[in-house]
């Protein structure tokens, strides 16, 4: 080659994961840029001689039209080496070169090249190279038939010369390109090209759009030394004689961006047309190859070309090639005319020679070189290897197939094409002899995998066979061959594997065994019992043959002794019976009327069902099966070559009896029956015992009818002796021939003058003492058919009896659950008693403070909680007369105004007259008692007035207790009298006293005064009574309560202790209540209230949650909307609370608002703030309201709660309070007022002073200029703006200096501006000499020019 050197750029692919590297198409470089919504893209990173590159500009804001194309052309520049030229210029081409792609997507195209202008028109352009290839000098000519140069008529120039380069579009180009002047270009026609040869000496060239988007491409003419083609391979390890794809990226070989295939160049070497790429495959250090011409398989388009160019078929020299693992030389390549070679494909003898001569081994380094025809090349190294051929073992069953697989890496001939190999499959008998062989073609799992496989299945047939298709291999065997057949799989190693792994110079076969998996069959009885009653209606067997489990319903046909599947015999059967006398009867399933067996769900289990009627016919007995008969079923299974057998033996079965008592959960022959704790006379319950008798022999005596029979009920004492009369009862068959007979009896205990009696089905049997503890109820049954007698027993025991309560302490009015647990109260496990169990409670009832408690007794109703439950439960209410008793809810007290006394006790009593300790000597009662302690409930007394309070306020006393809702009370609401609750309130309160005025008011004075009012709500009483200023007269007690101007008021109240007297009962072991009494005492907890009529009010003002009271820095802003600004005014005034002299009894008053800036006045109503404590709204000493501050333009004088603010000044707004607290007589006897006074203020508006000097302008005769000329006059003007929020008078100084020396007197200006207003301040100036003049303007706040707003603005202007 005649370049400076052949540049072998080797791309070494390092494979880390052991598999082939699938590179895919090489990633396209960064050849696109977006800015300002415009994207510019190029098709190639390199441009060179005779090559054309596409440039696309996507601008969605430019219309798709000729005008749009012209607009885009005017916004493109090209720059390199510090020189920038427009896209359309004489240095490039002044022809119309921009076209819009007519696809509706705003793409604009132009094409570029780096080709010198020829001297004349040319229909195509070429270049030549002389290269040394395979030691032979080769003359190469590369022609771009799509590139031409045309000399048009007119002033069209390219690189300063007449004419224009043009590109012929491919004839298959589907779109239209429309140029700047509306010219339309179709496929097969020419477009103009921009030539960049003006920049041929620059390594890089940048194409820019006016929005800032730009792309940079490389110039091959100036920088070919840095150009590098790249090569990537899809494989890292390959066998001998294989081919695969590589990707050769050679940008400079893409002559036409719109042409795939060879890229657009037409190339000849020594006069012979060749493809653009040649390749050399060498075994480095082993055997070198030569370059051979190779056909391009594919030219890959630019990734994402559709998005970049609006068209998908844009190319950049990314060639897909095929290469080979055979060294390319004359020995292993196909010779063509002109001494060219195609990639190697060797014959077997050549293949073997490469192996045996050691040229290709298990580790052969292969290097592949690819080159173009102008000297650019690249290489990649891979590994050639030989691997051992292996076969996978296989196990087949009818249910599960496996893949027949051969791993044959050496047989990969083309990594892009699947191929097949042949293997031999043989069937061998148990001795190892082959009796059937077939050759099977295995396909490759995917191209280049080297794994050859087909699914293989086992089928049942009448004769053995091996067949295959493209989808599977099928091996068919008759059942008798399953257990004695194996497989042998044989494949052929290629010569490489034979040589290196088997040490053979000839091709060797390898084999692996395969297995036929045979499932084990079974024959079992269902259920798994072989000794059965001779009255069993049906027997059933399960024949499980797993080799017939297909997953779908399967049927076997039974004919004679043969069992067949799809006509193929799978088993034989026989049935043999041996009678008790030794007679043998032989037959088969057919003889038992069985013609088929079915596995309904396809799991391989087939059910053999034989009714007893068929068995009787088979035996010849017809009416019965003799006891002792044996029946044997045999099946010979041909899959497993195994005989399966089950033998039944028939026996006679005795009847069975079982009972179920009220408390048992299932039937058995022995149960316990609990006696009721109370006789039927008290609790009318019947207790049922169910009886089940199973007598199949008797049922079969008349199988067509449901029969009845009787059994005896016998009562025995604990010694086993019968007592009383025998009772009979009838049991009935549930259905014809079912053999199950059912019935039931009931038992109770009756009390009469002679004592307690056990009663069965309404008959008194015996005195209860005879059986009370250990007696039996015996159920005796004798079968009418077999005369067998069986019995069941119910053991009689006295019932446990337990009383319980859900809690042992409770509050008055609370609900408490009470229950009795006694199994003797159960009627039946599935019955619920509809009656009640009555027990009793003893307690102390109380009418509240001021009264004494009394002892009372109340019945309690209990109900069975659920069917069959031994628990009878109920709920008692401990003293809430508003609750009505219903069902098992019992309210102990029904008298209104009474409750169970707090601090007392409730006794709950339940008795069992037939107790658990009863014996044959005596029926003993049993007593149960539970105690519930009643909690002491406090009565809380508090004062609701906020402290301190005014002497003129109403006193509010709150009494709180849950007892109030239980005692006498009115409906919730306000009252002027306590009514019937007065005694309770008097009993709670004790006295009201004052420290300074020495008042003493009793509870009776307070509650009965007509000036006192009341509020009641559930658990709360509130008592309100007036206070007034003490006149000074001692001992003047009463209502209103007279207090000093400063005083301390105290409220005391009573508490009550309840005492009950209990007396024990020696007989029952319980206690009884005989009396109760209440003892009052004064509580140590007192409620107090500070009285102070001299507390000054405090006014606070808030804006947006911030306190702005009397704060200049926290003023509210000037209102700038019609809605204005809201200000919260809050006054702390404890002496106004509950004060009758204040409007609304101390809940509201007015304050006066005065704006001192404009003299406006308004009133603002404040409302008392409350807080909820215990459900009661409690007043606070705080009063609040919202004041609205608005602009003067929307203000209406006299509107309450609204005031305006003057703009431009700070508004000081006063808030004044002057309110009468009360009246009093001074020492001279004159009536005087006591007033609450306060005053405060806040500010509206913060003055902002700000002046901005923002711009300097020079005018010459009204026209702006940037410089001055000596002797001419100019207006020097500064822009001044009032950025503050008030009117401002601005003083300013303007100076003009030259070299630091003033050239005219300082000018002082004065101007007044409103907020936001701007003006210009300046002077007329004529420069007298050239130089740089400094012009400065500084704004000041005062006429003394001592307080500047800011540093002003300084400008430097040159005069010439």
UniProtKB/Swiss-Prot annotation:
Signal peptide, first to last residue: 1-24
Chief location: secreted
Localization in the cell: Secreted, Cell wall, S-layer
Alphabetical list of InterPro entries matching this protein: SlaA-like (IPR053683)
One GO CC term, this protein: S-layer
UniProt keyword annotations, A-Z: Cell wall, S-layer, Secreted, Signal
Keyword Secreted included in the entry's annotation: yes
Keyword DNA repair: no
Its biological purpose: S-layer large protein. May form the highly ordered outer sheath.
Protein family (similarity comment): Belongs to the Sulfolobales SlaA family.
Subunit structure: The mushroom-shaped unit cells of the Sulfolobales' S-layers may consist of three SlaB subunits and six SlaA subunits.
Protein's recorded name: S-layer protein A
Organism: Metallosphaera sedula (strain ATCC 51363 / DSM 5348 / JCM 9185 / NBRC 15509 / TH2)
Gene behind the chain: slaA
């Amino acid at each position: 080659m005649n370049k400076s050197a052949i540049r072998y750029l080797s791309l070494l692919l390092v494979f880390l994961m052991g598999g082939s590297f699938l590179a895919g198409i090489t990633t396209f470089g960064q050849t696109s840029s977006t800015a300002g919504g415009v994207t510019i893209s190029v098709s190639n990173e390199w441009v060179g001689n005779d090559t054309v590159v596409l440039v696309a500009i996507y601008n969605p804001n430019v219309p798709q039209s000729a005008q749009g194309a012209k607009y885009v052309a005017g916004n493109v520049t090209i720059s390199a080496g510090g020189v920038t030229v427009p896209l359309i210029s004489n240095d490039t081409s002044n022809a119309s070169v921009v076209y819009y792609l007519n696809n509706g997507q705003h793409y604009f195209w132009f094409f570029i090249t780096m080709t010198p202008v020829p001297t004349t028109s040319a229909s195509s352009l070429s270049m030549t190279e002389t290269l040394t290839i395979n030691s032979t000098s080769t003359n190469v000519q590369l022609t771009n038939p799509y590139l031409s140069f045309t000399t048009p008529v007119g002033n069209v120039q390219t690189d300063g010369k007449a004419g224009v380069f043009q590109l012929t579009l491919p004839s298959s180009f589907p779109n239209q390109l429309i140029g700047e002047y509306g010219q339309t270009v179709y496929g097969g026609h020419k477009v103009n090209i921009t030539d960049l040869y003006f920049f041929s000496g620059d390594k890089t060239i940048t194409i820019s759009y006016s929005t800032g988007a730009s792309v940079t491409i490389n110039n091959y003419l100036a920088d070919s030394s840095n150009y590098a083609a790249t090569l990537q391979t899809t494989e890292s390890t390959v066998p001998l004689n294989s081919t695969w794809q590589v990707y050769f990226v050679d940008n400079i070989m893409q002559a036409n961006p719109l042409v795939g295939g060879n890229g657009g160049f037409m190339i000849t070497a020594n006069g012979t047309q060749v493809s653009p790429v040649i390749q050399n495959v060498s075994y480095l250090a082993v055997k070198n190859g030569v370059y051979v011409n190779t056909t391009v398989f594919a030219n890959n388009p630019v990734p994402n070309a559709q998005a970049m160019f609006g068209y998908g078929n844009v190319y950049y020299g990314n060639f897909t090639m095929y290469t080979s693992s055979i060294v390319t030389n004359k020995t292993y390549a196909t010779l063509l005319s002109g001494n060219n070679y195609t990639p190697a494909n060797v014959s077997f003898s050549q293949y073997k020679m490469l192996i045996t001569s050691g040229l290709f081994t298990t580790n052969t380094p292969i290097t592949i070189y690819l080159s173009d025809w102008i000297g650019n090349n690249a290489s990649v190294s891979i590994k050639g290897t030989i691997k051992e051929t292996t076969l996978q073992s296989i196990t087949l069953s009818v249910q599960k197939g496996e893949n027949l697989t051969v791993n044959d890496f050496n047989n990969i001939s083309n990594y892009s094409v699947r191929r097949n190999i042949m293997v031999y499959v043989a069937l061998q008998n148990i001795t190892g002899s082959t009796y059937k062989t077939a050759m099977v073609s295995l396909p490759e799992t995917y191209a280049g995998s080297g794994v050859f496989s087909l699914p293989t299945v086992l089928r049942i047939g009448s004769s053995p066979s091996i067949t295959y298709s493209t989808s599977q291999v099928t091996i068919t065997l008759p059942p008798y061959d399953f257990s004695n057949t194996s497989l042998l799989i044989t494949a052929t190693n290629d010569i490489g594997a034979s040589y290196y792994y088997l040490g053979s110079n000839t091709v060797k076969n390898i084999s692996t065994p395969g297995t036929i998996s045979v499932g084990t069959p079974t024959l079992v009885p269902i259920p798994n019992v072989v000794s059965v009653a001779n009255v069993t209606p049906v027997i059933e067997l399960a024949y499980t043959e797993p080799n017939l489990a297909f997953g779908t319903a399967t049927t076997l046909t039974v004919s004679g002794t043969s069992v067949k599947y799809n006509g193929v015999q799978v088993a034989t059967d026989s049935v043999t019976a041996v009678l008790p006398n030794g007679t043998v009867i032989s037959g088969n399933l057919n003889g038992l009327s069985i013609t088929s067996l079915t596995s309904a769900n396809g799991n391989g289990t087939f059910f053999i069902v034989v009714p007893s009627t068929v068995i009787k016919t088979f035996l010849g007995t017809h009416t019965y099966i003799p006891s002792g008969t044996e029946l044997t079923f045999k099946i010979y299974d041909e899959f497993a070559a195994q005989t399966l057998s089950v033998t039944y033996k028939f026996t006679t079965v005795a009847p069975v009896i079982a009972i179920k008592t009220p408390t048992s959960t299932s039937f058995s022959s022995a149960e316990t029956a609990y006696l009721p704790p109370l006789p039927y006379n008290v609790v009318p319950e019947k207790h049922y015992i169910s009886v089940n008798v199973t007598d199949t022999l008797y049922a079969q005596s008349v199988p067509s009818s449901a029969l009845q029979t009787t059994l005896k009920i016998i009562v025995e004492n604990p010694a086993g002796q019968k007592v009383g009369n025998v009772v009979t009862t009838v049991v009935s068959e549930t259905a014809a021939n079912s053999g199950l007979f059912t019935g039931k009896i009931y038992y109770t205990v009756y009390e009469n003058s002679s004592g307690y009696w056990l009663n069965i089905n309404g008959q008194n049997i015996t005195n209860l003492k005879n059986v009370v503890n250990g007696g039996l109820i015996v159920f005796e049954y004798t079968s009418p058919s077999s005369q067998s007698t069986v019995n069941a027993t119910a053991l009689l025991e006295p019932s446990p009896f337990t009383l319980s309560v859900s809690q042992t302490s409770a509050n008055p009015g609370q609900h408490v659950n009470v229950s009795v647990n006694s199994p003797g109260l159960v009627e039946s496990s599935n019955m619920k008693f509809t009656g009640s169990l009555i027990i009793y409670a003893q307690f102390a009832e109380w009418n509240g403070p001021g009264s004494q408690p009394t002892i009372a007794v109340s019945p309690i109703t209990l109900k069975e909680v659920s069917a069959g439950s031994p628990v009878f439960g109920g709920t008692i209410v401990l003293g809430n007369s508003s609750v009505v008793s219903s069902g098992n809810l019992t309210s102990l007290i029904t008298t209104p105004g009474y409750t169970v006394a707090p601090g007392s006790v409730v006794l709950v009593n339940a008795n069992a007259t037939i107790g658990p300790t009863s014996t044959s000597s005596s029926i003993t009662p049993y007593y149960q008692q539970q105690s519930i302690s009643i909690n002491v409930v406090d009565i809380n007394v508090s004062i609701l007035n906020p402290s301190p309070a005014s002497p003129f306020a109403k006193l509010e006393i709150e009494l709180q207790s849950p007892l109030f809702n239980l005692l006498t009370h009115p409906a919730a609401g306000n009252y002027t009298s306590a009514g019937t609750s007065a005694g309770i309130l008097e009993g709670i309160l004790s006295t009201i006293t004052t420290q300074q005025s020495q008042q003493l008011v009793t509870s009776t004075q307070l509650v009965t005064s007509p000036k006192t009012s009341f509020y009641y709500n559930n658990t709360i009483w509130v008592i309100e009574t007036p206070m007034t200023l003490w006149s000074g007269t001692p001992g003047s007690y009463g209502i209103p309560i007279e207090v000093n101007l400063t005083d301390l008021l105290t409220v005391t109240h009573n508490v009550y202790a309840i005492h009950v007297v209990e007396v024990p009962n020696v007989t029952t072991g319980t206690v009884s209540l005989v009396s109760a009494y209440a003892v009052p005492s004064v509580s140590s907890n007192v409620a107090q209230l500070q009285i102070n009529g001299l507390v000054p009010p405090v006014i606070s003002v808030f804006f947006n949650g911030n306190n702005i009271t009397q704060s200049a820095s926290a003023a509210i802003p000037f209102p700038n909307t019609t809605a204005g600004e809201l200000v919260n005014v809050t006054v702390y005034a404890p002496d106004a609370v509950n004060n009758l002299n204040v409007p609304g009894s101390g809940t509201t008053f007015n304050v006066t608002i005065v704006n001192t800036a404009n003299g406006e006045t308004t009133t603002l109503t404040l409302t008392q703030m409350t807080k909820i404590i215990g459900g009661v709204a409690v007043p606070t000493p705080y009063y609040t309201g919202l004041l609205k501050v608005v602009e003067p333009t929307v203000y209406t004088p006299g509107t309450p709660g609204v005031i305006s603010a003057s703009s431009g000044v700070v508004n000081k707004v006063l808030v004044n309070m002057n309110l009468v607290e009360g009246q009093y007589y001074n020492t001279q006897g004159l009536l005087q007022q006591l007033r609450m006074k306060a005053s405060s203020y806040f500010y509206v508006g913060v003055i902002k002073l700000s002046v901005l000097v923002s711009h300097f302008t020079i005018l010459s005769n009204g026209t702006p200029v940037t410089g001055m000329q000596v002797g001419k006059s100019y207006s020097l003007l500064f822009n001044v703006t009032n950025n503050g929020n008030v009117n401002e008078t601005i003083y300013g100084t303007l100076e003009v200096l030259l070299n630091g020396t003033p050239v005219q007197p300082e000018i002082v200006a004065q101007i007044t501006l409103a907020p936001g207003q701007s003006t210009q301040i300046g002077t007329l100036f004529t420069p007298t000499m050239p130089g740089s003049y400094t012009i400065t303007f500084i704004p000041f706040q005062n006429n003394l020019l001592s307080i500047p707003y800011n540093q002003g603005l300084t400008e430097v202007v040159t005069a010439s």
